[in-house]
Protein backbone atom coordinates (compact mmCIF):
# COMPACT_ATOMS: atom_id res chain seq x y z
CA UNK A 1 0.00 0.00 0.00
CA UNK A 2 1.19 3.43 -0.82
CA UNK A 3 0.53 6.43 1.40
CA UNK A 4 -0.95 9.38 -0.39
CA UNK A 5 0.22 12.79 0.79
CA UNK A 6 -1.66 15.90 -0.18
CA UNK A 7 -0.27 19.40 -0.16
CA UNK A 8 -2.62 22.12 1.15
CA UNK A 9 -0.30 25.07 0.61
CA UNK A 10 -1.92 26.17 -2.58
CA UNK A 11 -5.50 25.22 -1.68
CA UNK A 12 -6.07 25.51 2.09
CA UNK A 13 -8.97 23.48 3.41
CA UNK A 14 -11.97 24.91 5.14
CA UNK A 15 -10.89 23.41 8.52
CA UNK A 16 -7.68 25.46 8.57
CA UNK A 17 -9.53 28.64 7.76
CA UNK A 18 -12.01 27.93 10.60
CA UNK A 19 -9.16 27.47 13.06
CA UNK A 20 -7.65 30.78 12.03
CA UNK A 21 -11.00 32.45 12.43
CA UNK A 22 -11.41 31.08 15.97
CA UNK A 23 -7.87 32.11 16.86
CA UNK A 24 -8.63 35.63 15.71
CA UNK A 25 -11.94 35.75 17.60
CA UNK A 26 -12.42 38.55 20.05
CA UNK A 27 -13.11 38.21 23.77
CA UNK A 28 -11.40 37.65 27.09
CA UNK A 29 -8.55 35.17 27.43
CA UNK A 30 -7.83 33.11 30.56
CA UNK A 31 -5.03 30.53 30.92
CA UNK A 32 -5.07 28.07 33.84
CA UNK A 33 -2.28 25.60 34.61
CA UNK A 34 -1.52 25.21 38.32
CA UNK A 35 -5.14 25.58 39.50
CA UNK A 36 -6.73 23.43 36.79
CA UNK A 37 -8.10 20.85 39.27
CA UNK A 38 -9.78 23.55 41.34
CA UNK A 39 -11.50 24.82 38.20
CA UNK A 40 -12.77 21.34 37.30
CA UNK A 41 -13.98 20.69 40.88
CA UNK A 42 -15.93 23.94 40.81
CA UNK A 43 -17.82 22.73 37.72
CA UNK A 44 -18.53 19.42 39.48
CA UNK A 45 -19.95 21.27 42.51
CA UNK A 46 -22.12 23.55 40.35
CA UNK A 47 -23.51 20.57 38.43
CA UNK A 48 -25.39 19.48 41.59
CA UNK A 49 -27.06 22.86 41.93
CA UNK A 50 -28.34 23.81 38.47
CA UNK A 51 -28.56 22.63 34.85
CA UNK A 52 -26.98 25.79 33.43
CA UNK A 53 -23.96 27.85 34.39
CA UNK A 54 -23.71 31.59 33.83
CA UNK A 55 -20.22 32.81 32.88
CA UNK A 56 -19.47 36.45 33.62
CA UNK A 57 -16.32 38.26 32.53
CA UNK A 58 -15.15 41.49 34.16
CA UNK A 59 -12.05 43.26 35.31
CA UNK A 60 -12.36 41.47 38.65
CA UNK A 61 -11.86 38.09 36.99
CA UNK A 62 -14.04 35.17 35.91
CA UNK A 63 -17.32 34.33 37.67
CA UNK A 64 -19.35 31.09 37.50
CA UNK A 65 -22.95 31.59 38.69
CA UNK A 66 -26.08 29.51 39.13
CA UNK A 67 -29.44 31.08 39.96
CA UNK A 68 -32.70 29.53 41.08
CA UNK A 69 -35.73 30.58 43.08
CA UNK A 70 -34.41 29.01 46.29
CA UNK A 71 -30.63 29.18 45.83
CA UNK A 72 -27.84 31.28 44.38
CA UNK A 73 -24.21 30.19 44.06
CA UNK A 74 -21.18 32.04 42.69
CA UNK A 75 -17.52 31.05 42.23
CA UNK A 76 -15.30 34.12 41.94
CA UNK A 77 -11.83 33.63 40.43
CA UNK A 78 -9.52 36.62 40.73
CA UNK A 79 -7.03 37.52 37.96
CA UNK A 80 -4.23 36.19 40.22
CA UNK A 81 -5.87 32.75 40.10
CA UNK A 82 -4.92 32.39 36.40
CA UNK A 83 -1.46 32.11 34.92
CA UNK A 84 -2.45 34.61 32.23
CA UNK A 85 -5.44 36.92 31.98
CA UNK A 86 -6.43 39.41 29.27
CA UNK A 87 -9.70 41.34 29.50
CA UNK A 88 -8.85 44.24 27.22
CA UNK A 89 -10.93 42.97 24.28
CA UNK A 90 -14.33 43.17 26.00
CA UNK A 91 -16.69 46.07 26.50
CA UNK A 92 -16.18 47.06 30.13
CA UNK A 93 -19.31 49.20 30.28
CA UNK A 94 -21.67 46.41 29.22
CA UNK A 95 -22.78 43.34 31.18
CA UNK A 96 -20.70 40.48 29.78
CA UNK A 97 -22.65 37.34 30.69
CA UNK A 98 -23.24 34.18 28.64
CA UNK A 99 -25.00 30.92 29.43
CA UNK A 100 -23.51 27.44 28.95
CA UNK A 101 -25.14 24.07 29.41
CA UNK A 102 -23.91 22.14 32.44
CA UNK A 103 -23.60 18.95 30.37
CA UNK A 104 -21.21 20.73 28.02
CA UNK A 105 -19.14 22.08 30.91
CA UNK A 106 -18.90 18.63 32.49
CA UNK A 107 -17.83 17.13 29.17
CA UNK A 108 -15.01 19.65 28.81
CA UNK A 109 -13.50 18.88 32.23
CA UNK A 110 -14.36 15.18 32.29
CA UNK A 111 -10.81 13.86 32.35
CA UNK A 112 -9.51 16.62 34.60
CA UNK A 113 -12.10 15.91 37.28
CA UNK A 114 -10.97 12.28 37.56
CA UNK A 115 -7.38 13.39 38.20
CA UNK A 116 -5.72 12.31 34.97
CA UNK A 117 -2.12 13.46 34.62
CA UNK A 118 -2.31 13.98 30.87
CA UNK A 119 -3.76 17.49 31.24
CA UNK A 120 -1.29 20.32 31.66
CA UNK A 121 -3.34 23.48 31.20
CA UNK A 122 -6.46 25.06 29.78
CA UNK A 123 -7.16 28.24 27.81
CA UNK A 124 -10.52 30.00 27.63
CA UNK A 125 -11.62 32.40 24.89
CA UNK A 126 -14.93 33.90 25.97
CA UNK A 127 -16.90 36.43 23.94
CA UNK A 128 -20.35 37.01 25.49
CA UNK A 129 -21.73 38.33 22.18
CA UNK A 130 -20.58 35.32 20.15
CA UNK A 131 -22.41 32.05 19.61
CA UNK A 132 -19.58 29.77 20.71
CA UNK A 133 -16.90 29.61 23.37
CA UNK A 134 -13.49 28.15 22.61
CA UNK A 135 -11.68 25.95 25.15
CA UNK A 136 -8.20 24.67 24.35
CA UNK A 137 -6.87 21.87 26.57
CA UNK A 138 -3.11 21.38 26.67
CA UNK A 139 -1.99 17.77 27.21
CA UNK A 140 1.27 15.87 27.49
CA UNK A 141 3.56 15.27 24.48
CA UNK A 142 2.54 18.62 22.92
CA UNK A 143 -1.03 17.56 22.26
CA UNK A 144 -3.79 20.15 22.22
CA UNK A 145 -7.53 19.53 22.22
CA UNK A 146 -9.72 22.35 20.98
CA UNK A 147 -13.41 22.41 21.96
CA UNK A 148 -16.02 24.82 20.61
CA UNK A 149 -18.93 24.87 23.04
CA UNK A 150 -22.19 26.37 21.85
CA UNK A 151 -23.65 29.07 24.07
CA UNK A 152 -27.32 29.32 24.94
CA UNK A 153 -29.51 32.36 24.66
CA UNK A 154 -30.12 34.51 27.68
CA UNK A 155 -33.86 34.34 28.27
CA UNK A 156 -34.02 37.29 30.65
CA UNK A 157 -31.70 39.66 32.40
CA UNK A 158 -30.05 38.45 35.55
CA UNK A 159 -31.26 40.13 38.72
CA UNK A 160 -28.74 40.12 41.51
CA UNK A 161 -30.12 38.55 44.70
CA UNK A 162 -30.55 40.98 47.57
CA UNK A 163 -28.75 39.65 50.63
CA UNK A 164 -25.85 40.80 52.75
CA UNK A 165 -23.50 38.95 55.07
CA UNK A 166 -23.19 41.88 57.45
CA UNK A 167 -26.94 41.78 58.15
CA UNK A 168 -26.73 38.29 59.66
CA UNK A 169 -26.40 38.25 63.44
CA UNK A 170 -25.24 34.63 63.81
CA UNK A 171 -21.86 33.42 62.52
CA UNK A 172 -20.43 29.90 62.70
CA UNK A 173 -17.09 28.75 61.29
CA UNK A 174 -16.29 25.03 61.22
CA UNK A 175 -13.97 22.74 59.27
CA UNK A 176 -15.53 20.84 56.38
CA UNK A 177 -14.05 17.57 57.69
CA UNK A 178 -16.35 17.90 60.73
CA UNK A 179 -19.54 18.49 58.74
CA UNK A 180 -18.97 16.05 55.88
CA UNK A 181 -19.43 12.72 57.82
CA UNK A 182 -22.67 14.04 59.31
CA UNK A 183 -24.26 15.18 56.05
CA UNK A 184 -23.12 12.13 54.09
CA UNK A 185 -25.37 9.97 56.28
CA UNK A 186 -28.31 12.28 55.52
CA UNK A 187 -27.76 12.73 51.78
CA UNK A 188 -30.81 10.62 50.97
CA UNK A 189 -33.11 13.27 52.45
CA UNK A 190 -34.31 16.45 50.79
CA UNK A 191 -33.81 18.80 53.73
CA UNK A 192 -32.39 18.84 57.25
CA UNK A 193 -33.10 20.91 60.35
CA UNK A 194 -30.40 22.79 62.24
CA UNK A 195 -30.92 24.13 65.76
CA UNK A 196 -28.40 26.72 66.92
CA UNK A 197 -27.77 27.65 70.55
CA UNK A 198 -24.88 29.08 72.53
CA UNK A 199 -23.70 25.54 73.31
CA UNK A 200 -23.35 24.45 69.67
CA UNK A 201 -25.21 23.05 66.66
CA UNK A 202 -27.79 20.27 66.55
CA UNK A 203 -28.48 18.75 63.11
CA UNK A 204 -31.37 16.34 62.67
CA UNK A 205 -33.46 14.78 59.94
CA UNK A 206 -36.87 13.15 60.11
CA UNK A 207 -38.58 10.13 58.63
CA UNK A 208 -40.20 10.78 55.28
CA UNK A 209 -43.99 11.15 55.21
CA UNK A 210 -44.78 9.27 52.00
CA UNK A 211 -48.36 8.42 52.96
CA UNK A 212 -49.45 11.95 53.83
CA UNK A 213 -52.73 13.02 52.25
CA UNK A 214 -55.18 15.85 52.80
CA UNK A 215 -57.13 13.63 55.22
CA UNK A 216 -54.27 12.60 57.56
CA UNK A 217 -52.07 15.68 57.20
CA UNK A 218 -52.74 16.93 60.73
CA UNK A 219 -52.10 13.54 62.32
CA UNK A 220 -48.86 12.92 60.44
CA UNK A 221 -47.57 16.40 61.18
CA UNK A 222 -47.88 15.83 64.91
CA UNK A 223 -46.32 12.37 64.63
CA UNK A 224 -43.08 13.57 63.04
CA UNK A 225 -40.30 11.24 64.19
CA UNK A 226 -36.60 12.01 64.34
CA UNK A 227 -34.41 9.76 62.22
CA UNK A 228 -30.87 11.01 62.95
CA UNK A 229 -29.67 13.68 65.36
CA UNK A 230 -26.09 14.94 65.80
CA UNK A 231 -24.76 17.66 68.09
CA UNK A 232 -21.55 19.61 67.47
CA UNK A 233 -20.22 21.31 70.60
CA UNK A 234 -18.44 24.65 70.71
CA UNK A 235 -15.10 22.92 71.19
CA UNK A 236 -15.19 21.63 67.60
CA UNK A 237 -16.19 25.00 66.15
CA UNK A 238 -13.55 27.51 65.12
CA UNK A 239 -15.89 30.45 65.69
CA UNK A 240 -19.40 30.53 67.10
CA UNK A 241 -21.05 33.91 67.65
CA UNK A 242 -24.77 33.68 68.41
CA UNK A 243 -27.09 36.57 69.22
CA UNK A 244 -30.43 34.84 68.63
CA UNK A 245 -30.98 31.07 69.12
CA UNK A 246 -32.81 29.84 66.01
CA UNK A 247 -33.97 26.63 64.35
CA UNK A 248 -34.58 26.33 60.60
CA UNK A 249 -34.62 23.83 57.73
CA UNK A 250 -32.69 24.01 54.45
CA UNK A 251 -31.89 21.89 51.40
CA UNK A 252 -29.09 19.37 51.89
CA UNK A 253 -28.07 18.68 48.28
CA UNK A 254 -26.59 22.11 47.52
CA UNK A 255 -25.09 22.46 51.00
CA UNK A 256 -23.37 19.08 50.70
CA UNK A 257 -21.81 19.99 47.33
CA UNK A 258 -20.09 23.06 48.83
CA UNK A 259 -18.98 21.13 51.92
CA UNK A 260 -17.48 18.41 49.70
CA UNK A 261 -15.61 21.03 47.67
CA UNK A 262 -14.24 22.60 50.87
CA UNK A 263 -13.19 19.21 52.22
CA UNK A 264 -11.17 18.51 49.06
CA UNK A 265 -9.30 21.76 49.66
CA UNK A 266 -9.03 21.17 53.43
CA UNK A 267 -10.53 24.57 54.24
CA UNK A 268 -13.17 25.90 56.61
CA UNK A 269 -16.85 26.59 55.95
CA UNK A 270 -18.34 29.90 57.13
CA UNK A 271 -22.08 30.09 57.79
CA UNK A 272 -23.98 33.37 58.14
CA UNK A 273 -27.64 33.09 59.16
CA UNK A 274 -30.44 34.88 60.95
CA UNK A 275 -34.13 34.17 61.50
CA UNK A 276 -35.97 31.49 59.50
CA UNK A 277 -37.10 32.91 56.19
CA UNK A 278 -33.84 34.76 55.64
CA UNK A 279 -31.12 33.07 53.53
CA UNK A 280 -28.37 30.88 54.92
CA UNK A 281 -25.08 32.07 53.41
CA UNK A 282 -22.34 29.43 53.12
CA UNK A 283 -18.93 30.67 51.99
CA UNK A 284 -15.30 29.59 51.67
CA UNK A 285 -12.99 32.51 52.39
CA UNK A 286 -9.67 30.89 53.28
CA UNK A 287 -8.06 31.27 49.83
CA UNK A 288 -7.03 34.74 48.63
CA UNK A 289 -7.36 34.02 44.88
CA UNK A 290 -10.93 32.73 44.75
CA UNK A 291 -14.10 32.98 46.78
CA UNK A 292 -17.22 30.79 46.96
CA UNK A 293 -20.63 31.85 48.18
CA UNK A 294 -23.91 29.92 48.38
CA UNK A 295 -27.21 31.45 49.50
CA UNK A 296 -29.89 28.93 50.49
CA UNK A 297 -33.51 29.58 51.38
CA UNK A 298 -34.52 28.60 54.92
CA UNK A 299 -37.85 27.62 56.33
CA UNK A 300 -39.22 27.50 59.87
CA UNK A 301 -42.48 26.75 61.61
CA UNK A 302 -45.43 29.00 60.78
CA UNK A 303 -46.20 29.62 64.45
CA UNK A 304 -42.78 30.84 65.53
CA UNK A 305 -41.63 33.43 62.99
CA UNK A 306 -42.90 36.56 61.29
CA UNK A 307 -40.99 37.39 58.11
CA UNK A 308 -41.50 41.11 58.62
CA UNK A 309 -39.41 40.93 61.77
CA UNK A 310 -42.08 42.41 64.02
CA UNK A 311 -41.97 39.53 66.44
CA UNK A 312 -38.20 39.81 66.82
CA UNK A 313 -38.24 43.06 68.79
CA UNK A 314 -40.92 41.73 71.12
CA UNK A 315 -39.04 38.51 71.81
CA UNK A 316 -35.77 40.35 72.40
CA UNK A 317 -37.44 42.79 74.82
CA UNK A 318 -39.16 39.96 76.66
CA UNK A 319 -35.89 38.08 76.85
CA UNK A 320 -34.14 41.07 78.47
CA UNK A 321 -36.97 41.56 80.98
CA UNK A 322 -36.89 37.89 81.88
CA UNK A 323 -33.15 38.01 82.54
CA UNK A 324 -33.62 41.01 84.89
CA UNK A 325 -36.45 39.30 86.74
CA UNK A 326 -34.53 36.03 87.03
CA UNK A 327 -31.49 37.82 88.53
CA UNK A 328 -33.71 39.68 91.05
CA UNK A 329 -35.50 36.47 91.97
CA UNK A 330 -32.21 34.57 92.45
CA UNK A 331 -30.87 37.32 94.76
CA UNK A 332 -34.05 37.27 96.89
CA UNK A 333 -33.91 33.48 97.12
CA UNK A 334 -30.31 33.67 98.35
CA UNK A 335 -31.35 36.09 101.10
CA UNK A 336 -34.10 33.73 102.21
CA UNK A 337 -31.70 30.81 102.32
CA UNK A 338 -29.28 32.83 104.50
CA UNK A 339 -32.10 33.73 106.90
CA UNK A 340 -33.02 30.10 107.23
CA UNK A 341 -29.43 29.16 108.04
CA UNK A 342 -29.18 31.80 110.81
CA UNK A 343 -32.50 30.81 112.39
CA UNK A 344 -31.53 27.15 112.59
CA UNK A 345 -30.35 25.61 115.85
CA UNK A 346 -26.85 25.00 114.59
CA UNK A 347 -27.03 21.22 114.54
CA UNK A 348 -25.93 19.12 111.61
CA UNK A 349 -29.47 18.11 110.79
CA UNK A 350 -30.60 21.71 110.39
CA UNK A 351 -27.63 22.50 108.15
CA UNK A 352 -28.40 19.56 105.89
CA UNK A 353 -32.02 20.61 105.80
CA UNK A 354 -31.14 24.18 104.82
CA UNK A 355 -28.79 22.97 102.09
CA UNK A 356 -31.47 20.72 100.62
CA UNK A 357 -33.94 23.61 100.76
CA UNK A 358 -31.58 25.94 98.93
CA UNK A 359 -31.04 23.30 96.24
CA UNK A 360 -34.79 22.81 95.85
CA UNK A 361 -35.27 26.56 95.65
CA UNK A 362 -32.67 26.96 92.91
CA UNK A 363 -34.22 24.13 90.91
CA UNK A 364 -37.63 25.75 91.27
CA UNK A 365 -36.25 29.11 90.20
CA UNK A 366 -34.99 27.55 86.98
CA UNK A 367 -37.71 27.97 84.42
CA UNK A 368 -39.27 25.26 82.30
CA UNK A 369 -38.57 24.83 78.55
CA UNK A 370 -40.39 27.40 76.47
CA UNK A 371 -42.77 26.89 73.58
CA UNK A 372 -41.10 29.70 71.71
CA UNK A 373 -37.80 28.45 70.36
CA UNK A 374 -36.23 31.91 70.35
CA UNK A 375 -36.61 32.27 74.09
CA UNK A 376 -35.12 29.26 75.91
CA UNK A 377 -36.96 29.88 79.21
CA UNK A 378 -40.44 30.79 80.39
CA UNK A 379 -40.73 34.23 82.07
CA UNK A 380 -40.60 34.11 85.85
CA UNK A 381 -43.85 36.10 86.03
CA UNK A 382 -45.74 33.21 84.44
CA UNK A 383 -44.74 30.84 87.24
CA UNK A 384 -47.14 30.31 90.11
CA UNK A 385 -46.58 31.78 93.55
CA UNK A 386 -46.19 28.26 94.95
CA UNK A 387 -42.91 27.86 93.09
CA UNK A 388 -41.46 30.77 95.09
CA UNK A 389 -42.74 29.51 98.41
CA UNK A 390 -40.06 28.30 100.84
CA UNK A 391 -41.06 25.64 103.34
CA UNK A 392 -38.84 24.70 106.28
CA UNK A 393 -39.04 21.13 107.47
CA UNK A 394 -37.69 21.20 111.06
CA UNK A 395 -38.41 18.83 113.89
CA UNK A 396 -40.01 20.85 116.70
CA UNK A 397 -40.52 19.71 120.26
CA UNK A 398 -44.19 19.37 121.22
CA UNK A 399 -45.47 22.16 123.43
CA UNK A 400 -46.91 21.22 126.85
CA UNK A 401 -50.27 22.69 125.90
CA UNK A 402 -50.66 20.40 122.96
CA UNK A 403 -49.56 17.22 124.75
CA UNK A 404 -52.22 14.55 125.07
CA UNK A 405 -52.60 13.20 128.60
CA UNK A 406 -53.13 9.47 128.60
CA UNK A 407 -55.75 8.62 131.24
CA UNK A 408 -56.50 5.07 132.25
CA UNK A 409 -60.16 4.22 132.13
CA UNK A 410 -61.50 2.75 135.41
CA UNK A 411 -64.10 -0.03 135.26
CA UNK A 412 -66.55 -0.42 138.12
CA UNK A 413 -66.27 -3.98 139.42
CA UNK A 414 -69.82 -5.00 140.24
CA UNK A 415 -70.14 -7.52 143.08
CA UNK A 416 -70.87 -11.02 141.93
CA UNK A 417 -74.01 -12.35 143.58
CA UNK A 418 -73.75 -15.98 144.57
CA UNK A 419 -76.67 -17.91 145.92
CA UNK A 420 -75.94 -20.88 148.08
CA UNK A 421 -78.36 -23.75 148.22
CA UNK A 422 -79.38 -24.58 151.68
CA UNK A 423 -78.21 -27.89 152.88
CA UNK A 424 -81.65 -28.60 154.34
CA UNK A 425 -83.27 -29.33 150.99
CA UNK A 426 -81.63 -32.12 149.03
CA UNK A 427 -81.98 -32.88 145.37
CA UNK A 428 -83.98 -36.02 145.91
CA UNK A 429 -86.61 -34.20 147.88
CA UNK A 430 -86.94 -31.61 145.16
CA UNK A 431 -87.47 -34.27 142.52
CA UNK A 432 -90.17 -35.89 144.54
CA UNK A 433 -92.01 -32.62 144.94
CA UNK A 434 -92.13 -32.07 141.16
CA UNK A 435 -94.32 -34.52 139.23
CA UNK A 436 -93.75 -34.66 135.48
CA UNK A 437 -96.67 -35.87 133.36
CA UNK A 438 -96.54 -36.47 129.60
CA UNK A 439 -99.80 -35.40 127.95
CA UNK A 440 -100.26 -36.88 124.46
CA UNK A 441 -101.52 -34.41 121.91
CA UNK A 442 -103.82 -35.84 119.26
CA UNK A 443 -103.78 -34.14 115.91
CA UNK A 444 -106.91 -34.81 113.89
CA UNK A 445 -106.47 -35.65 110.27
CA UNK A 446 -109.12 -33.21 109.24
CA UNK A 447 -107.19 -30.27 110.51
CA UNK A 448 -104.08 -31.25 108.56
CA UNK A 449 -103.68 -28.96 105.61
CA UNK A 450 -101.59 -30.49 102.83
CA UNK A 451 -98.81 -28.27 101.69
CA UNK A 452 -97.83 -28.59 98.10
CA UNK A 453 -94.24 -27.87 97.31
CA UNK A 454 -93.63 -26.80 93.78
CA UNK A 455 -90.11 -26.75 92.41
CA UNK A 456 -89.37 -23.77 90.32
CA UNK A 457 -87.73 -25.54 87.43
CA UNK A 458 -89.09 -23.36 84.66
CA UNK A 459 -86.43 -20.65 84.80
CA UNK A 460 -83.76 -23.35 84.80
CA UNK A 461 -85.33 -24.89 81.72
CA UNK A 462 -85.49 -21.50 80.09
CA UNK A 463 -81.86 -20.94 80.93
CA UNK A 464 -81.00 -24.34 79.52
CA UNK A 465 -82.96 -23.61 76.39
CA UNK A 466 -81.14 -20.35 75.96
CA UNK A 467 -77.70 -21.93 76.26
CA UNK A 468 -78.65 -25.14 74.48
CA UNK A 469 -76.57 -25.73 71.38
CA UNK A 470 -78.78 -26.61 68.43
CA UNK A 471 -77.86 -29.89 66.81
CA UNK A 472 -77.55 -29.95 63.06
CA UNK A 473 -80.41 -31.66 61.26
CA UNK A 474 -79.51 -34.62 59.17
CA UNK A 475 -81.06 -35.09 55.81
CA UNK A 476 -82.93 -38.32 55.18
CA UNK A 477 -81.54 -40.50 52.45
CA UNK A 478 -82.69 -43.65 50.68
CA UNK A 479 -80.36 -45.75 52.85
CA UNK A 480 -82.08 -44.47 56.02
CA UNK A 481 -85.53 -45.56 54.70
CA UNK A 482 -84.16 -48.96 53.76
CA UNK A 483 -82.56 -49.47 57.17
CA UNK A 484 -85.79 -48.42 58.88
CA UNK A 485 -87.79 -51.03 56.95
CA UNK A 486 -85.25 -53.73 57.75
CA UNK A 487 -85.39 -52.80 61.43
CA UNK A 488 -89.21 -53.04 61.46
CA UNK A 489 -89.16 -56.46 59.73
CA UNK A 490 -86.62 -57.85 62.20
CA UNK A 491 -88.55 -56.51 65.21
CA UNK A 492 -91.88 -57.83 63.82
CA UNK A 493 -93.51 -54.47 63.75
CA UNK A 494 -93.98 -54.38 59.98
CA UNK A 495 -97.29 -56.10 59.10
CA UNK A 496 -98.20 -54.69 55.77
CA UNK A 497 -95.09 -55.55 53.78
CA UNK A 498 -92.77 -58.39 54.69
CA UNK A 499 -89.42 -59.08 53.21
CA UNK A 500 -87.11 -62.02 53.03
CA UNK A 501 -83.55 -61.68 54.23
CA UNK A 502 -82.21 -63.35 51.09
CA UNK A 503 -83.55 -60.54 48.99
CA UNK A 504 -81.00 -58.17 50.42
CA UNK A 505 -78.21 -60.07 48.74
CA UNK A 506 -79.96 -61.22 45.54
CA UNK A 507 -78.45 -59.24 42.69
CA UNK A 508 -80.94 -60.48 40.13
CA UNK A 509 -83.89 -58.99 41.98
CA UNK A 510 -82.23 -55.62 42.31
CA UNK A 511 -83.57 -53.44 45.13
CA UNK A 512 -85.71 -54.64 48.02
CA UNK A 513 -89.14 -55.93 46.91
CA UNK A 514 -92.23 -56.88 48.92
CA UNK A 515 -93.50 -60.52 49.16
CA UNK A 516 -96.35 -59.95 46.73
CA UNK A 517 -94.02 -58.74 44.06
CA UNK A 518 -91.63 -61.65 44.72
CA UNK A 519 -94.43 -64.27 44.31
CA UNK A 520 -95.56 -62.76 41.04
CA UNK A 521 -92.02 -63.12 39.70
UniProtKB/Swiss-Prot annotation:
Which parts form a coiled-coil structure per UniProt?
none
Q: Which is a Gene Ontology cellular component entry for this protein?
A: nucleus
Q: Where is the composition biased (Polar residues)?
A: 355-370, 493-504
Q: What happens when the gene is disrupted?
A: RNAi-mediated knockdown disrupts hus-1 localization to the nucleus.
What residue ranges are annotated as transmembrane?
Answer: none
Q: Which Pfam families match?
A: Rad9
- List, in alphabetical order, the GO biological process terms annotated in this UniProt record: cellular response to ionizing radiation; DNA damage checkpoint signaling; DNA repair; DNA replication checkpoint signaling; mitotic intra-S DNA damage checkpoint signaling
Disordered: annotated span: 1-20, 318-375, 492-521
What this chain does, per the entry, is described as:
May be a component of the 9-1-1 cell-cycle checkpoint response complex that plays a major role in DNA repair.
Please give the family membership noted in the entry.
Belongs to the rad9 family.
UniProt subunit comment: Putative component of the toroidal 9-1-1 (RAD9-RAD1-HUS1) complex, composed of hpr-9, mrt-2 and hus-1.
Recorded protein name is Cell cycle checkpoint protein hpr-9
What organism does the UniProt record list as the source? Caenorhabditis elegans
Please state the gene responsible for encoding this protein. hpr-9
